[in-house]
Amino acid sequence: MEVREIPLPAATKLAADYITGAFPAESGFAYAQADDEAFCRRLAYLQGRTYDREGLADYLRAYHRRFSASVATMANIEKLRNERSVVIVGGQQAGLLTGPLYTIYKIITIIQLAKEQERKLGVPVVPLFWIAGEDHDIAEIDHVYVVEEGEVKKAAYPHKTNEKRMAADVLLDRMAAKEWIERVVKTYGETDVTNELLFFLSSCLDEARTFVDFFAAIVLRLFADHGLVVLNAGDAAVRPLERRFFAALIERHRDVTAAVLAQQEALRTLGYAPLIEIGRDAANLFYYDGRERSLLQYDEERGLFHNKAGTLVWTREELLELAETNPARLSNNVVTRPLMQEHLLPTLAFVAGPGEIAYWAELKEAFPLFDLEMPPVVPRLQATIVSRSLQTDLSDIGLEVADVLTGRLDEAKREWREATAQAPLASAFAKAKADIDAAHRPLRELGVAIDRGLEGLVAKNAAILQAQIEFLQHALERALLRKHETEWRKFWRIETSLRPNGALQERVWNVFYYINRYGFDFVEKLLAIRSPGNGMHKIVYM
């Protein structure tokens, strides 16, 4: 395995500028850089604060026992009782089979950074993955992408399409899930690893009742030796730990909204468009009745909290009572989730994708409202996997991986198509069209001379003749492409692997395609990638 680096700008302008150092970091973040000096300062800050470490460790120990978590994971949970311990945290939705590769890359970054900082700082550093089990948009996590019939297709797990419960509560039908897994893995092709892979996923499914369970079971096994800890943000059992902070969020909801709106305006003046959609009436919490999440708003005039439809209404006192007596009825939104994370966890650093980097900058002024400080924000690993056969294809057509990732492939395809299928026919068909037009012109003139009312008819007849010639030209072009199909399929393989549906590989393909091809030590190989946190895109040649 060989790893090279290329500069590849992030999709969001703010994240791209933050990674390269062009963004004025003090305008969006508490730490200008996520470097050793920042981690030392952050550690000193954390050691001046208190957390409910016993409650957190007790909850996590009980949760992980459900999944027969590894000795390393259980040991890391116990480390959290140590007043000096800290965590490296990052999170994502609970995608089926872990979703796109970027989720795995985020976990890898968390683990790498935790090991590095534990060695440098001399304190226990726990790698923790925050599973966004509160999310209710199941359509975002119910599928993976596969190649079928020569096309990149979405393979969705069959479930109720109008599902509105949190992912943590959406049950999996074991037989339907097993059949779906087999269908997905079949598209990967049979290898020496396939049976082991199917057994692995079946074993994870045995431990799972819900989408989140399945995700947790998979990542806890994949990273068992590295002591990964997970936190299911949609678990009702974690809500008692959040009760006090829910009350604080209710008390200061107007201040939170005002802080975000003001920060968004400040970023606009710097040329950065905001990502978070938030109105002045936002309460930044959801109410959850076990079936559906309702985003809460605040009616300033009446002094009442309510859902959008106005069918659920609370006074401030009633909502505070709910937070105290039944906190499982509340959950966080995009604004309050990072704040809750900081309340619960002694976070040394937050590992973020490009979108998260951009929207966290919008939250800068919300943290101080609760005497919190935004942690250092570390960009996750960004990578593209290149197989040996794909390296040959790239060499044959004269392209580098960087060319493909920066959009050069479409131009190369067009040039090849023109040279291979269009150029050899172009002059012959241009002459044929001109000759037919010349032969037809006297007939058009004769028709119009006989009856001017025939002008439209003769013009249409001429167009039909030209269209038939173009039809024949396209048919011959397709025949030439078939003749050169071996060469054409190189373009298809490159595009499908590196730029599927025009997106980055890490945003489409799933880790188990690569495990099926390279074995379970594929994940260990990724963990061995030295990731200096310089924001460069890693090209991993297998």
Swiss-Prot record:
EC number: 6.-.-.-
Ligase as UniProt keyword: yes
Keyword set includes Nucleus: no
Keywords annotated in UniProt: Coiled coil, Ligase
GO molecular function: ligase activity
Coiled coil: 458-487
Matches recorded under Pfam families: CC_BshC, Rossmann-like_BshC
Role: Involved in bacillithiol (BSH) biosynthesis. May catalyze the last step of the pathway, the addition of cysteine to glucosamine malate (GlcN-Mal) to generate BSH.
HAMAP family linked: BshC
Family: Belongs to the BshC family.
Protein name: Putative cysteine ligase BshC
Originating gene: bshC
